[in-house]
A protein has these predicted regions:
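Gram-negative outer-membrane beta-barrel transporters
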Residues: 348, 396, 400, 408, ...
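N-terminal periplasmic accessory domains that precede
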Residues: 67-70, 89-93, 129-132, 144-168, ...
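Short acidic/polar hinge/loop motifs at secondary-structure boundaries
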Residues: 111-136
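Structural signature of Gram-negative outer-membrane beta-barrels, strongest in the C-terminal barrel
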Residues: 228-235, 245, 337-340, 345-355, ...
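Membrane-embedded beta-barrel scaffold of Gram-negative outer-membrane proteins
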Residues: 178, 290-315, 444, 450-456, ...
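Periplasmic-side early beta-strands and strand-to-turn transitions of outer-membrane beta-barrels
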Residues: 159-160, 166-168, 180-276, 308-319, ...
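Surface-exposed extracellular loop regions of Gram-negative outer-membrane beta-barrel proteins
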Residues: 250-265, 355-367, 412, 417, ...
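C-terminal beta-signal and adjacent terminal beta-strands/loops
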Residues: 543, 547, 601-608, 626-677
Length: 677
């Protein structure tokens, strides 16, 4: 397991709070405690885990306007896209979605609802907070939660009127406009605006890549339009409430834009003569019904949610033009019961869960003179699960926790097509049962200092390839499973927050791509081990001022008995990472000034299992200055990537040569927000 080299680091992490113990004070009552939607703040699952919670003001200060910018404020998290925003590449703690872009290693939740995998990268609308839970969360969250969970919590309408308008412009003719209005319709009963709690967002982030064949010079960017409506029925002095939310998002993108591997400062695409511009249009509709009933000892939650997504995608691939429209439908239902109150010896959570996903894919690969390949595929996946999570408070300082989840997964596929006039097709069905568990123990050494240990399991279910492959049968792959061992500590006072952990994760039956180039399919082909240590600290060293610092070192490798990549590094996992920021408030007679300076370091990593395509270490520096011009007006200017550092975000072998996607470089902008109330 190669844990010996981590023991000194683990010991150091446990001793860190002792250094700061001279500053011990009672924890500020306003300290935000992670709840992660499914647990009580007193549960072992919420406390015996490495977690980070970021508030809306912190997101705004860091310029986090979309989920792929969350690594700026969530240490250890890495998010990029592989081609375009439909296919996110996420890594956390050495667990990576490198081998299956339809199943990210970290699951994104919005108000307790899991998002479609192709909707993981999305604009953020009216966010109240973001929570990150590190390590497998399989017992409470089920499949595809091997690396962890990101839970976005949005602002819910209540009796307080709220409203604002926001706008900004930035480099490459980009701009952003946003409107929000919420409040009581009938005070004490129904909350929302006249038509509900409304948020409207238009976000344009243009690129600067050039297609020499068409002359287009703004490729590589996105243009998103989003609207949502919320209603909340919550009568005063009643133990129940109900909610409804609906949203629609449409994004146009030109992101399938690549340059030569060694031409990362160039703007001309590596593309065949006469090739059209890449284009993608994604539209997603979401609806959620929720209810809550509270007694003296229990709280019951019911959620039913639906998502419908369709997208069209066209891009050049060598001498071929690819058209790949796709439709997704997903519905989720969950019933959850949890204990309530602070005087209980045992806290409990019980739940029933169902998730059904259906997908249809049409694809066509055309040569200049004739069709090459066309196919139509249908896949389904369904999960039925029951889970429980218990915490036994042995004393007021010592607790132990355990959880178990039983899942029944079903999947099916049916596809047909033609390759150079030769038909192909197949169909299949599979089902599988999984039992996952987790155990943890935590002890409060002082009122501010906690140590814990945790063992938890995660998995990705069995299933079929989304994209049909000519000449191959419909053969399912089995579930990928992982187990994580963790030792950590957390120290919190009004002035200092410290968190450290060391971990080891073993993954088996990895779902890897295998087969000849152009005919690759997912199959079970290997194991991987990830070991690492992480540290996160925040010091509020003066009124209105704080200093954040974080870092991690990770070794994530395929084991020697892996069929394809034995001994190689797992792709998309940086060997190390670090970040630091200083935030402050300077009071002046003309209004408060709010400076921020942040640096982020990303270590070397590979884009392929063969470890041929390597991105070296890079660092970026971001700065901003906010001005509270009046009580209701805020103006901020910012420069992201101040020194215009260019680096690769994704790459692959195109024939005998490699191509890469690169970041956009320096971005300068200004934002203004005006509050109505």
């Amino acid at each position: 397991m190669k844990m010996t080299r981590l023991y000194p680091l683990a010991l150091g992490g446990l001793l860190l709070p002792a250094i700061a113990n001279a500053q011990t004070s009672q924890q500020d009552e306003s300290t935000l405690v992670v709840t992660a939607s499914k647990q009580s703040s007193r549960s072992a699952s919420a406390n015996n885990v490495s977690s980070t919670v970021v508030s809306a003001p912190e997101l705004s200060d860091a310029g986090v306007t979309a989920s792929d910018k969350l690594p700026r404020v969530l240490p250890g998290l890495n998010i990029e896209n592989s081609g375009n925003m439909l296919f996110s590449t996420i890594s956390l703690r050495g667990v990576s979605s490198a081998q299956d872009f339809y199943n990210p290693a970290v699951t994104l939740y919005v108000d307790g609802v899991p998002q479609l995998s192709t909707n993981t990268i999305q604009a953020l609308t009216d966010v109240q907070s973001v929570e990150l839970l590190r390590g497998p969360q399989g017992t409470l969250y089920g499949k595809s939660a091997q690396g962890g969970i990101i839970n976005i919590v949005t602002q819910q309408p209540d009796s307080t009127p709220r409203g604002y308008i926001e706008g900004g412009v930035s480099s490459r003719d980009s701009y952003r406009s946003k409107f929000n209005l919420s409040g009581p319709i009938q005070d004490g009963l129904l909350y929302g605006s006249v038509t509900g709690s409304v948020t409207l967002l238009r976000q344009v982030d243009d690129g600067d890549m050039i297609n020499p064949a068409t002359g287009s010079d703004d490729l590589g960017g996105t243009r998103a339009s989003i609207g949502n409506v919320k209603l909340r029925l919550a009568p005063d002095d009643q133990p129940w409430e109900m909610g409804f939310a609906a949203s629609r998002e449409c994004t146009r993108a030109t992101q399938d834009a690549y340059v030569g591997w060694n031409d990362i400062k160039g703007r001309k695409l590596s593309i065949s003569d006469g090739s059209p511009d890449p284009y993608m249009r994604r539209c997603t509709d979401s609806q959620t019904l929720s209810g809550k009933y509270t007694t003296d000892d229990w709280v019951f939650n019911l959620i039913s949610a639906w998502q419908q997504q369709h997208y069209s995608r066209t891009f050049p691939s060598g001498s071929l033009i690819v058209n790949m429209p796709q439709r997704w439908n997903q519905d989720v239902q969950e019933l959850r019961a949890a204990t309530l109150g602070d005087a209980r010896t045992v806290d409990m959570v019980f739940g029933l869960y169902r998730q059904n996903t259906r997908e249809k894919l049409n694809s066509a690969y055309d040569m200049p003179t004739m069709p090459y390949l066309s196919s139509t595929g249908y896949t389904t996946a369904e999960t039925l699960a029951a889970y429980s999570d218990l915490t036994w408070h042995l004393t007021d300082r010592f607790d132990i926790g355990g959880g178990v989840r039983f899942s029944h997964d079903k999947s099916s596929t049916q596809y047909h097509g033609s390759m150079l006039g030769n038909p192909f097709g197949d169909q299949g069905k599979s089902n599988d049962d999984q039992v996952l568990g987790q155990l943890s123990a935590g002890y409060m050494l002082t009122d501010d200092w906690r140590v814990y240990t945790r063992v938890a399991q995660g998995y990705k279910p069995s299933g079929y390839n989304i994209v049909p492959t000519a000449g191959l049968d419909a053969k399912p792959f089995v579930a990928e499973k992982s187990i994580n061992y963790e030792l950590g500590t957390r120290y919190e006072t009004a002035d200092v927050t410290l968190q450290a952990a060391t971990f080891y994760t073993h993954t088996k039956d990895m779902q890897l791509y295998s087969g000849p180039v152009g005919m690759q399919t997912l199959s079970n082909a290997g194991k991987a081990d990830a070991t690492g240590v992480e540290l996160e600290a925040k010091w509020r060293f003066a009124p209105g001022w704080s200093w954040d610092i974080n870092g991690n070192v990770i070794r994530s490798e395929f084991t020697n008995d892996s069929e394809l990549y034995h001994g190689n590094r797992v792709p998309f996992v940086p060997r190390y990472g670090a970040g630091s920021s200083v935030n402050g408030v300077i009071d002046t007679r003309y209004g408060a000034l709010m400076p921020r300076l942040a640096v982020n370091l990303v270590g070397p990593h590979y884009f392929d299992g063969d470890n041929q395509l390597r991105q070296g270490t890079y660092a970026t520096l971001d700065s901003s200055l906010g001005w509270q011009a009046t009580e209701r007006m805020n103006i901020s200017v910012y420069v992201d990537n101040l020194f215009d550092r260019r680096y690769r975000t994704y790459g692959y072998m195109n024939g005998s040569s490699a191509v890469a996607q690169v970041n956009m470089g320096r971005t300068v902008g200004i934002n203004t927000r005006i509050d109505f109330f």
